[in-house]
Curated annotation (Swiss-Prot):
GO cellular component, one term: cytoplasm
Signal peptide interval: none
Assigned EC number: 5.4.3.8
Membrane-spanning residues: none
Organism this protein belongs to: Helicobacter pylori (strain G27)
High-level lineage: Bacteria, Pseudomonadati, Campylobacterota, Epsilonproteobacteria, Campylobacterales
Keyword Cytoplasm belongs to the record: yes
Molecular functions (GO terms): glutamate-1-semialdehyde 2,1-aminomutase activity; pyridoxal phosphate binding; transaminase activity
Subcellular compartments: Cytoplasm
Any one biological process term the GO annotation gives: protoporphyrinogen IX biosynthetic process
Pfam families documented for this protein: Aminotran_3
Pathway stated in the Swiss-Prot or TrEMBL entry: Porphyrin-containing compound metabolism; protoporphyrin-IX biosynthesis; 5-aminolevulinate from L-glutamyl-tRNA(Glu): step 2/2
Domain of life: Bacteria
Protein name: Glutamate-1-semialdehyde 2,1-aminomutase
Keyword tags: Cytoplasm, Isomerase, Porphyrin biosynthesis, Pyridoxal phosphate
């Protein structure tokens, strides 16, 4: 496999785009590679400018549950496009989509549509602080909630502490109200409650940005109880897991009803769309009814809403969709683990519905510290081998993979066979 055109394209992009990419992970820096420049996608496959094709386990980082260029979704987008791209005014489609979202999630009365997961979490936190009338926020090490300043925070000295900025350009003042606790650790979390005047807690119930690390059920139930005890708003960030892990996101697995929730990715079917929502008494604090300001020129734009609505209609019609996707994810993760065992390579694998992850690690991964113990050098070697064998995996050991509806058992088995070849070559030093 050659990537000559992609190499040239990447060099050219670096001249006019900061870093050559519009989101850092796309640069393939952590796997020491060159990103293939994509020409098109269809179904489960990606096609690059060098005429290579790949089984795509990234699926645009999660939104494409029906794969690339789904004919029904594509047709509906084109029909909507003919009527206009954006109006800056209400449409019936927005209400229809909101009804579909609300109907799938317990405790969700109202939503507000936005353009990105970052906007959704940022707005949800502002709303939660207004409702609780308390400023401090608890987040968890390893969870990602977008790139707003108050959330680009890492733990300081100790696992339960007021955080420090994790990015240049973020003033300390932005992080002084953010406490960072250890994921899956209730003791660490309650320490944070005792240290600050906590108004809200935000968490990925199925974390997808330290690799795939699901919350333990007793932890999430305990977190809900702590929020009730300390009168804090619980925000579940389901931007990635919502409509992905199941029709009801994490609720299928945990049964936890949050005060607020954020969705994204699947609800936009590959176009920029996200939302936040929750109980009516909280949501009604939003302008124009209440005093919490939030707005967006392109929020609820008809193309994204049409795409998302088309995807949700397809999901709801297909009663066995999640069962099939889960079975394929299990087939893949079990196949990868068995292959690694044949070469005495430590590999931990897991899936939650159509989300899957794997760590080159001898032990189960329950939090960010565990994830950091994984062999990232081995991951980089494995990723490069798989890429050149036509299998497109997330280009970081701290990302999550995704199954899409067009995938078949034959595709999964082929990917496992390529993994076996890759492990063999790595062990032999080829």
């Amino acid at each position: 496999m050659e990537l000559l055109h992609s190499i040239n394209d990447f060099n050219e992009a670096k001249q006019v785009i900061a870093g050559g990419v519009n989101s850092p992970v796309r640069a393939f820096k952590s796997v020491k590679g060159t990103p293939p420049f994509i020409l098109k996608g269809k179904g489960a496959y990606l096609y690059d400018v060098d005429n290579n094709h790949y089984i795509d386990f990234v699926q645009s980082w999660g939104p494409l549950i029906f794969g690339h260029a789904d004919e029904e979704i594509e047709k509906n987008i084109i029909n909507t496009l003919k009527k206009g791209t954006s109006f800056g005014a209400p449409t019936e489609l927005e209400t229809t989509l909101a009804k579909e979202i609300v109907s799938c999630y317990e405790g969700l009365d109202k939503v507000r549509l936005v353009n990105s997961g970052t906007e959704a979490t940022m707005s949800a936190i502002r709303l939660a602080r207004a409702y609780s009338q308390k400023d401090d926020l608890i987040k968890f090490e390893g969870c990602y909630h977008g790139h707003s300043d108050s959330l680009l925070v890492k733990a300081g000295s100790g696992c339960a502490t007021f955080g420090s900025p994790s990015s240049l350009g973020v003033p300390n003042d932005f992080s002084k109200h953010t406490l960072v606790a250890r994921y899956n650790d209730l003791n660490s979390t309650e320490e944070c409650f005792k240290k600050g005047d906590v108004g809200c807690v935000i968490i990925e119930p199925i974390a997808g940005n330290m690799g795939l690390v699901p919350a333990q059920k007793e932890f999430l139930l305990g977190l809900k109880a702590l929020c009730e005890k300390y009168q804090a708003v619980l925000i579940l960030d389901e931007v990635m897991s919502g409509f992905r892990a199941s029709l009801s996101g994490s609720q299928e697995f945990y049964g936890v009803v949050p005060d607020l929730v954020t969705f994204g990715k699947v609800i936009g079917a590959g176009l920029p769309l996200a939302c936040f929502g929750g109980r009516a008494e909280i949501m009604d604090l939003l302008s124009p009814i209440g005093g919490v300001y939030q707005a967006g020129t392109l929020s609820g734009n008809p193309l994204a809403v049409c795409a998302g609505l088309s995807a949700l209609y397809k999901i709801k019609r297909d009663k066995t969709l999640y069962t099939r996707l889960n079975a394929l994810a299990v087939r893949l993760t079990q196949g990868l683990k068995k292959s690694a065992q044949n070469y005495n390579i430590a590999l931990e694998t897991l899936n939650m519905g159509s989300m899957f992850g794997f760590f080159f690690n001898e032990n189960a991964v329950c939090d960010f510290d565990d994830a950091l113990k994984s062999d990232t050098e081995m991951f980089a070697k494995f990723h490069q081998k798989m890429l050149f064998k036509g299998v497109y995996l997330a280009c970081s050991s701290f990302e999550t993979g995704f199954i899409c509806e067009p995938m078949t058992e034959e595709m999964i088995d082929l990917a496992v066979a390529k993994a076996d070849e890759s492990f063999d070559e790595i062990i032999k030093g080829v």
